[in-house]
């Protein structure tokens, strides 16, 4: 019984780790800005990495001096700063400074022209996610190999491994790749996340102009390093 409780607590910590990563790397919203401006992001990142035994130094999300204004005004100012930076980094005109798509990184590694959606790695990710019950939200056209979506998948699989019930439309544990949530998690972590996210985190740290994205890069790098 003790081992089961310990295992569940580790899986819960992993789920929290990937939840924070997903929040940090999708398009910035008020929830993220409030957490980063108020110090909650820094606190959560430190606690999660400590719980997982990952000794990493993550810089302050709002910079060394913090936000100039406390409370909602500080969060609003941070959100206004993060959104154009996220667009520059992850969308770009014409090219992003740091593509958030696994398929683009795989194509770059292979020396071929990356094509969103139709490249082999992106299609492989989409098949894996659908086999886990995670599909593209209705009305959206976002490729499923986006870094935040991959973090969300790992969060869901970790929650399942911790004992959470399957969400609507998701297979039972035996129906997941590898026959269990833990096996599916390890397969996706080693075969996908760890194959490209370390390099993504390194480039993000180098390209980021806002301290939050340098912090997010250090945090993600600790998770996949």
Where are these regions (language model features)?
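Surface/interface-facing alpha-helical segments and adjacent flexible terminal/loop regions used
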Residues: 1-225
